[in-house]
Amino acid sequence: LHLCDRRQRQMCIRDRDNLTYESESEYGVIEISLDSVVELQKTSDEHYIYMDFLTPHEVYDKVVVIDAGHGGNAPGATKQGINEKDIDLAIVLKVKELFDEAGDESVGVYYTRTDDSNPSLEQRVDMANKAGADLFISVHNNSTKSGRMSSINGTAVMYDEEKASEENGSMQLAQICLEEMTAALGSTSKGIVKGHEIYIIRTAEMPVALIEVGFMTNQDELNRLNDEAYQKEAAQAIYNAIYRAFQEGY
């Protein structure tokens, strides 16, 4: 968090431990490192800047965390010089554009990464858990086990089968995502797939869906996945799935 205000001669911040930082200069930068997901509410008067840290649900009716798979030195599937991590991120950034453009102040959306970084699996799921997210969506792309080019193609969505009996749970969310993705992309449905062994699925405390948009080991699908227009269609489908889930009671 960086907070700059040229108008204030004195700046003061107090956290829960009553830690105080003050600066008498005309310009200051306050940098705060937090171990949880919070929203900043800032007010000021002639002398002070006051900051309150609120939980996401104190600000928003609904909270979503969206994860772009892999990143950094973990490229994911790689074919013909195309890295899965880049496609995952491109789609998620286009989802972000849709939420930013909509400006829906009732929904708070957080992203595990918006650049070529590689948060640990623990950091990714911790963000969702600490934010008290209502939904956790992770975006990936698939490949065959051998990694060889193949005719196998299509969209699959993974869910937590250990929580399959829950109403409005992971399995139902996965089905919503699958239906929206295949309808928008015209891709083959590979169904919803059990994924409890996947760390972020197993440890998420809310309904989670891990979307495998397509197969990078299929030439036609690889070409589409690397196409910006197709990425926009995938992003729109994810956006639609999130709002559909809310409409269905999540």
Where are these regions (language model features)?
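Structured beta-strand segments within beta-sheet-rich domains
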Residues: 14-33
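Active-site-adjacent mobile loop/cap segments within catalytic or ligand-binding domains
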Residues: 141, 145, 189-250
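Short secondary-structure junctions
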Residues: 14-15, 34-37, 183-188
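Single conserved hydrophobic/aromatic residue that forms the stacking wall/gate
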Residues: 2-13
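Catalytic-core regions of hydrolytic enzymes
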Residues: 45-179, 183, 187, 223, ...
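Surface-exposed edge beta-strands and adjoining flexible/disordered loops or tails in beta-rich
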Residues: 1, 27-60
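N-terminal post-signal-peptidase region of extra-cytosolic proteins
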Residues: 14-19, 118-123, 195-196
